[in-house]
């Protein structure tokens, strides 16, 4: 069952869900908690590779990703990151999230931003039980105009579901957890798939 605003507030108070910095009461509404945009981004650089062979050897996949992904881009306070039509960028939430083994989280984009063509997460919106770290956002501008994204703007909302029992292998305990404790806009680690 999805947690209500009262249940979310209680989980934050007791520490079973940790959001740091802790959101104001106004950020919790209905069944969600608003999250803000952090100041770190990554983009695909200009490149000459015609494609990335995701089924190729791990080392070749990683080399290709290293060639096309930018270094971390940090946007100073008060300035904006411009996402142009047809572009994909990675960003990160301002907040860090910690979930227990019996709660799964979901990230939803804002309807007001979607109506401008902004996808906040391309596909990955589930946050596994046991997650710890910031949430990487996969932005895509499907609109017709560039969008100015400023750190600390409300970018999405988290909602939570309590599971019938704790999971046997929470994310932060899995050896295969590629994004454990992420604190910045981490590029794809698909080359680490087994």
Swiss-Prot record:
Question: Which GO MF terms are attached to this record?
Answer: dCTP deaminase activity; nucleotide binding
Any GO BP annotation: dUTP biosynthetic process
Give the pathway listed in the UniProt entry for this protein: Pyrimidine metabolism; dUMP biosynthesis; dUMP from dCTP (dUTP route): step 1/2
The UniProt keywords, alphabetically, are: Hydrolase, Nucleotide metabolism, Nucleotide-binding
Q: What class of enzyme is it?
A: hydrolase
Q: Which Pfam families match?
A: DCD (PF22769)
Q: Binding positions for dCTP?
A: 110-115, 128, 136-138, 171, 178, 182
Q: Which residues form the active site?
A: 138 (proton donor/acceptor)
Signal peptide feature range: none
E.C. number: 3.5.4.13
Disordered: where is this region? 172-194
Q: For this protein, what reaction is catalysed?
A: dCTP + H2O + H(+) = dUTP + NH4(+)
Q: In UniProt terms, what function does this protein have? A: Catalyzes the deamination of dCTP to dUTP.
Family, similarity comment? Belongs to the dCTP deaminase family.
Q: Subunit details for this protein?
A: Homotrimer.
Q: Which HAMAP family match?
A: dCTP_deaminase
Q: What is this protein called?
A: dCTP deaminase
